[in-house]
C-alpha cells in the first residue's frame, strides 16, 4: 500500500482544533503528516494562544507531498494570501492535479488562488458569498475533483475522513476505534 504524505500549513493565528486534530487523524491513518511554518521560530501561536512546535519551515519541499492542507483561523487567510510563494504553491498543486484541502477561512485562501473555480465546495457560515467561483454546498465536508473543503472548528473529523477518502484510504477502522458513531457522527 502506498504511503501518503500531507503538508499541513501553520501560521500565527491558526485555529488549533482545525490544525492539530487533522494532523492527529491523518497520522492515525498512516499518512506521514507534517506541519509547516512560515518563520524560523519553531513555535506557531494559535487563536487561543496555544503554542505549537511546527515540524518544518515552508519550502519547495511541500511540492513533494501528496496533499496540502490549509486550516482556518480568523487572521490566517489574509496572511496566507499575502504570501506569494505559498499562493504559487497552491496554484502549482492545482495545475498538477494534486490534492488540496482547506477548511473554514482556509477555503477563502483556496478561492483567492483560483483552486475552487467550477468545483463544489463548502466553508464557514456565510462564506457562500466569499467562495464565488465554487458551487457552494451546505455540507460539513465536500470532496470534488482534487479539492476537499470543510466548514469550521467542529468539523475536523469529517474533513480528515474526506481527505482519507480522496487518498483512497479506508478510515472506517479509525472511525470505529475513536467511537465516532457513538459520539453522534453524522458524516
Please place each PLM-identified region on the residue numbering.
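Short amphipathic alpha-helix
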Residues: 21-22
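N-terminal beta-loop-helix "entrance" segment that forms/cooperates
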Residues: 36-55
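Short N-terminal binding/cap micro-motifs at the start of the first secondary-structure element
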Residues: 14-18, 43
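Active-site-adjacent pocket-lining segments in enzyme domains
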Residues: 3-10, 14, 25-37, 55-56, ...
